[in-house]
């Protein structure tokens, strides 16, 4: 396809599908950000995807810069993954028993992240972080957890406080239904502030079971850790007998073959994984030092279980994705992110729009800000009202960016020259829309 057929001509079918969905699903979606709450307008109902292209229910095609919020590093419907999934499904969808494939996937992941000696497979990133926190408490005999403002670790009660992702998108401080008791043992500190961490350990060190942090946050937008930040967290936790939990649900096996660990090799006690590791199907994992992981049932007293954990079809998708993602794939991911960042910066500069484009490997974000964004407060203080007009100008031109200023942009290795032509054609209009926006432009 060429750049001449790029305009989105109608969203009538998506609008009807959204109306139908709202009649049976709260808000019409099964994850809040998909409702376009932050940007307004009609959510696109996607019916198929191949390579770097999405097709909606009205037949419009979009160059995909979301990649299912990260997992699709190879692009959509990659032949190797489709074949592996088809073969696995033909042998049965779920057994409720151990399978060879789950051991293969665990071994593949352990081979890439040196501190991970044992791995437990689960069904979602939320399960992974919830279980890692429980395990840290069970291992240390302590109750308090430190998390950071803007870091999102799933929707488990104890970790929703001042979270990023959809919580930031909707402007919620936490969530109704999270009781004071559930959050009482969660200490929330500003991100990238080591002095706050040290002071908190000085006051509460003997009560702190763990610090949990995104390896490089992407759920308040991409806000990378300061140089040496994760290593300093490792040192402080080790000094006080607490565990360090590094959440690589987003970065794991995306930003490098070994995830963020391959860029910043800090030996955390526990890691969490998701997204890429299962190739777009529902699965996640947590793992770490054998001494800690062997406190899990059935070896130890810390209970964790799941009927569908280690699902053979998801395991097959994950193995195929990881084994197909060779050095050439990671080089393409980095090159595509570089190319996208240059196009974004060029268009916004030409339009006179102050901006920051922070990077975490091949993940990036766009903040409308004159100064660097280093924490959640700075992200929220950026000119987020410019984002909705920017987003819709891209969407109307057949480019599918993230529908929130507080989410990461993702590229796939399949992003091709035709897609980049479309993006380049769309960006000047989108940048002008951002330039002309006012605070009243908010949806």
From Swiss-Prot:
Enumerate the Gene Ontology biological process terms. Answer: protoporphyrinogen IX biosynthetic process
Q: Which UniProt keywords apply?
A: Cytoplasm, Isomerase, Porphyrin biosynthesis, Pyridoxal phosphate
Q: In which pathway does it act?
A: Porphyrin-containing compound metabolism; protoporphyrin-IX biosynthesis; 5-aminolevulinate from L-glutamyl-tRNA(Glu): step 2/2
Q: Which residues carry this modification: N6-(pyridoxal phosphate)lysine?
A: 275
The record lists the catalysed reaction(s) as: (S)-4-amino-5-oxopentanoate = 5-aminolevulinate
Its cofactor is:
pyridoxal 5'-phosphate
Q: Where does it localize?
A: Cytoplasm
Instruction: Report the EC code(s) recorded for this entry.
Output: 5.4.3.8
**InterPro entries to which the protein is assigned, alphabetical:** 4pyrrol_synth_GluAld_NH2Trfase (IPR004639), Aminotrans_3 (IPR005814), Aminotrans_3_PPA_site (IPR049704), PyrdxlP-dep_Trfase (IPR015424), PyrdxlP-dep_Trfase_major (IPR015421), PyrdxlP-dep_Trfase_small (IPR015422)
Q: What CDD domains does the entry give?
A: OAT_like
Question: Which GO CC annotations does the UniProt entry carry?
Answer: cytoplasm
Molecular function (GO) terms for this protein are: glutamate-1-semialdehyde 2,1-aminomutase activity; pyridoxal phosphate binding; transaminase activity
Complex formation: Homodimer.
Query: Which family does this protein fall into?
Result: Belongs to the class-III pyridoxal-phosphate-dependent aminotransferase family. HemL subfamily.
Protein name, per record:
Glutamate-1-semialdehyde 2,1-aminomutase
Q: Which organism is it from?
A: Mycobacterium ulcerans (strain Agy99)
Gene of this entry: hemL
């Amino acid at each position: 396809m060429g750049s001449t057929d790029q305009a989105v001509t109608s969203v009538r079918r998506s609008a009807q599908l959204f109306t139908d969905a709202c009649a049976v699903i709260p808000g019409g979606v099964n994850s809040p950000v998909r409702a376009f709450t932050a940007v307004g307008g009609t959510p696109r109902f996607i019916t198929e995807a191949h390579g770097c292209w999405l097709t909606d229910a009205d037949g419009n095609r979009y160059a995909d810069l979301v990649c299912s919020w990260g997992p699709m590093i190879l692009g959509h419907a990659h032949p190797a993954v489709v074949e592996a999934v088809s073969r696995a499904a033909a042998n049965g969808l779920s057994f409720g028993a151990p399978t060879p494939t789950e051991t293969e996937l665990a071994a593949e992941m352990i081979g890439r992240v040196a501190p991970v000696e044992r791995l437990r497979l689960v069904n979602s990133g939320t399960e992974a972080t919830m279980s890692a926190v429980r395990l840290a408490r069970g291992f240390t005999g302590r109750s308090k957890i430190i998390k950071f403002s803007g870091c999102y670790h799933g929707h488990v009660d104890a970790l929703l406080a001042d979270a990023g992702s959809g919580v930031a998108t909707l402007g919620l401080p936490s969530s109704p239904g999270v009781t004071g008791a559930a959050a009482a043992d969660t200490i929330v500190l500003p991100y990238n502030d080591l002095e706050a961490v040290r002071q908190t350990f000085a006051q509460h060190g003997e009560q702190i079971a763990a610090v949990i942090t995104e390896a490089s946050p992407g759920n308040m937008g991409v806000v990378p850790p300061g140089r040496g930040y994760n290593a300093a967290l490792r040192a402080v936790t080790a000094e006080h007998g607490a565990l360090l939990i590094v959440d690589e649900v987003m970065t794991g096996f995306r930003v490098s073959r070994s995830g963020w660990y391959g860029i910043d090799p800090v030996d955390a006690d526990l890691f969490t994984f998701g997204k890429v590791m299962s190739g777009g199907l529902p699965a996640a994992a947590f793992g770490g030092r054998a001494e800690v992981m062997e406190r899990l049932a059935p070896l130890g007293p810390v209970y964790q279980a799941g009927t569908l954990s280690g699902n053979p079809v998801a395991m097959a998708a994950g193995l195929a994705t990881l084994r197909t993602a060779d050095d050439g794939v990671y080089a393409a991911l980095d090159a595509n992110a570089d190319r996208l960042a240059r196009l974004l910066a060029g268009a916004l500069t030409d339009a006179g729009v102050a901006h920051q484009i922070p990077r975490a490997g091949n993940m990036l974000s766009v903040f409308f800000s004159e100064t660097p964004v280093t924490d959640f407060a700075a992200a929220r203080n950026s000119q987020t009202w410019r984002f909705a007009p920017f987003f819709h100008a891209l969407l109307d031109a057949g480019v599918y960016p993230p529908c929130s200023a507080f989410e990461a942009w993702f590229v796939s290795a399949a992003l091709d020259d035709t897609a980049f032509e479309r993006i380049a054609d769309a960006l000047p209009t989108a940048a002008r829309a951002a330039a002309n926006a006012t605070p009243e432009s908010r949806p």
